[in-house]
C-alpha cells in the first residue's frame, strides 16, 4: 500500500526503521523512490546496510542516529513523505517527523488499533508540529494477522 501512496520520484524518510519496515519493501517495490532509513541502534543499522547491499538497493540509504538529533536532521534534509511503523505515540512522532517536512510533506504512520485514539488524544500536539488533515485508513490483515491502521497527515 505504501508504494501506491507515494508519488513518482519521491523522497521518503523512514523514522526508526528497525528491521527495515516499511522502508526496505518500499525501496524494492519502487526503485524510482529515494528512501532514507533512520535507525539509532548500531546492530540494526549493520543489518540494514547488509540488506541494502545484498539486494543492491541503490535507492536506499541507511543513517544511524535519532530522528530528533540536529546533525541527523541536517544530514538527511527534507522529504516528500515521512513514514514510520510502531515507533512512538503519534504526538511525539509528529514532532520528530516535522524536522524532515516541508510544506506539503505527507506523514504516513503505520499504527495498530490505537490509531484513532492517538489522533484524538494527540491532536493538539500534532497540530503544533504543523500537521493537518489527519485521516486513518484501515488495512485488513486477514484472519491470522492484526489489521494495520495508516495515519496520514499533511504538513502546512
Q: What do these predicted regions represent?
A:
Residues 9-18:
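Conserved class I S-adenosyl-L-methionine
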Amino acid at each position: 500500500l505504501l508504494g501506491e501512496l507515494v508519488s513518482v520520484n519521491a523522497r521518503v524518510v523512514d523514522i526508526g526503521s528497525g528491521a527495515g519496515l516499511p522502508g526496505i519493501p518500499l525501496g524494492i517495490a519502487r526503485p524510482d523512490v529515494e528512501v532514507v532509513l533512520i535507525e539509532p541502534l548500531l546492530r540494526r543499522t549493520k543489518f540494514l546496510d547488509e540488506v541494502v547491499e545484498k539486494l543492491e538497493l541503490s535507492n536506499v540509504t541507511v543513517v544511524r542516529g535519532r530522528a530528533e538529533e540536529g546533525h541527523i536532521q541536517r544530514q538527511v534534509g527534507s522529504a516528500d513523505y515521512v513514514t514510520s511503523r510502531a515507533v512512538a505515540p503519534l504526538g511525539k512522532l509528529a514532532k520528530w517527523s516535522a524536522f524532515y517536512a516541508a510544506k506539503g510533506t505527507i506523514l504516513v504512520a503505520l499504527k495498530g488499533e490505537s490509531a484513532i485514539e492517538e489522533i484524538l488524544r494527540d491532536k493538539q500536539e500534532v497540530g503544533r508540529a504543523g500537521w493537518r488533515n489527519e485521516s486513518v485508513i484501515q488495512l485488513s490483515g486477514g484472519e491470522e494477522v492484526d489489521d494495520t491502521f495508516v495515519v496520514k497527515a499533511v504538513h502546512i
